[in-house]
């Protein structure tokens, strides 16, 4: 019979959370805890979206405050058992617990950085910041990402990836200050840390209006919306510079975002960095590219970081997905009604009053969908929502020759 731990004697004395409810107005600094002789343990073969990793106190109790969260309802770590004593390495000194190191750009900004705010709220010297790795091959990606972070923020982070079992003299564990979904709003300390430590002495680019495009190196099926190349042409005629963020250093990205007056683009992770600028004078427009709350949540993040004139532009039309899939959301691609988007952008001051845009014709849509079909190696069929199933349809009616069906 398993005995339930006495949580009144572990961490801050509270029961483990089933959800992580982060109030963007509620300070977290008072909830920082210190664990003596803490053991950090990640299961060696565990890697990916959720890893088996726990922090234990000197009585071998798992510390609930060290659980990492992706979103309000989804954890990034799952419990594991206390490691064998002879496999634990000693790591002297006092360290800050950073949570999970995840190498994807957006998750790095929103999750990996989510406890660094505590660096401004501890009054004792530390050796550095400890992270559990999401993937076992982490040396190159960690060096690259933390190096890029140092291009845009001071000071550089002295980090250590815990790919073995370690016992530290003292581990400072702050609450997680941000994440994805609702957690994008971040705690007050997290927002202050980002905006305070962000470098702001970059040389202006001369590009006042920027469109952050997804037509470059994004080869993931459903990463774009139909006709994005056409939208780029329309915006270039309005004076916008088409910017492929993934082709630029973080320093150059921030240089563009800090010197622009207007930034437009489909919802995606580059807007986290845009929002980190916290510029009250910046005009931000996030174009919804697929059903869901992403665009609105990105705008809410803009607002709490101090960007007052930020808007979500939701003008989706029809949607298609890959035949054979049980859930359309996995590979869904949508049309954006350019005529409605044009009206909205004019009203918000993002384009000139004389602009007149037309929706894509069915011929253009079919051309775009055919490229999607070849990329997905599956027929493209219309769907009426993210939960629609196309499992009753063969992947390809004509084997090896993906087609487009504008209607079923």
Walk through the language-model features, giving the residues of each.
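The feature primarily captures lumenal catalytic ectodomains
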Residues: 1-408
């Amino acid at each position: 019979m398993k005995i339930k731990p006495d949580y009144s004697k572990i961490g801050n004395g509270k029961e483990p959370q089933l959800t992580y409810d982060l109030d963007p107005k509620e300070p977290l600094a008072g909830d920082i805890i210190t664990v003596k002789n803490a053991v950090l343990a990640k299961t060696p073969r565990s890697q990916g979206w959720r890893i088996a990793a726990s922090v234990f106190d000197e009585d071998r109790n798992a510390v609930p405050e060290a659980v990492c969260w992706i979103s309000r309802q989804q954890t990034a770590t799952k419990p594991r058992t206390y490691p064998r004593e002879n496999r634990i390495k000693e790591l002297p000194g006092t360290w800050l617990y950073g949570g999970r190191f995840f190498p994807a750009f957006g998750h790095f900004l929103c999750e990996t950085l989510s406890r660094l705010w505590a660096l401004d709220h501890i009054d004792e010297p530390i050796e550095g910041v400890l992270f559990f790795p999401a993937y076992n091959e982490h040396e190159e990606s960690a060096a690259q990402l933390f190096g890029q972070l140092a291009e845009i923020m001071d000071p550089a982070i002295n980090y250590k990836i815990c790919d073995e079992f370690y016992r530290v003299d003292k581990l400072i564990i702050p609450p997680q200050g941000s994440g994805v979904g609702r957690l994008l709003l971040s705690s007050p300390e997290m927002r202050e840390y980002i905006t305070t430590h962000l470098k702001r002495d970059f040389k202006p680019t001369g590009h006042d209006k920027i469109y952050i495009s997804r037509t470059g190196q994004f080869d993931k099926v459903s990463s774009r919306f139909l006709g994005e190349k056409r939208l780029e042409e329309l915006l270039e005629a309005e004076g916008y510079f088409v910017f492929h963020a993934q082709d630029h250093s973080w320093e150059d990205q921030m240089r563009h975002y800090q010197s622009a007056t207007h930034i437009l683009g489909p919802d995606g992770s580059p807007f986290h960095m845009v929002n980190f600028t916290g510029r009250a004078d910046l005009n931000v427009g996030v174009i919804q590219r697929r059903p869901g709350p992403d665009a609105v949540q990105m705008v809410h993040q803009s607002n709490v970081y101090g960007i007052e004139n930020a808007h979500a532009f939701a003008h989706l039309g029809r949607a298609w997905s890959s035949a054979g899939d049980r859930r359309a959301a996995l590979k869904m691609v949508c049309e954006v009604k350019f005529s409605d988007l044009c009206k909205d952008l004019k009203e918000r001051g993002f384009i000139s009053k004389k602009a007149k845009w037309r929706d894509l014709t069915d011929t253009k849509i079919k051309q775009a969908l055919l490229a999607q079909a070849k990329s997905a190696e599956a027929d493209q069929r219309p769907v009426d929502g993210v939960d629609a199933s196309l499992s009753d349809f063969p992947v390809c009616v004509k084997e090896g020759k993906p087609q487009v069906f504008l209607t079923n």
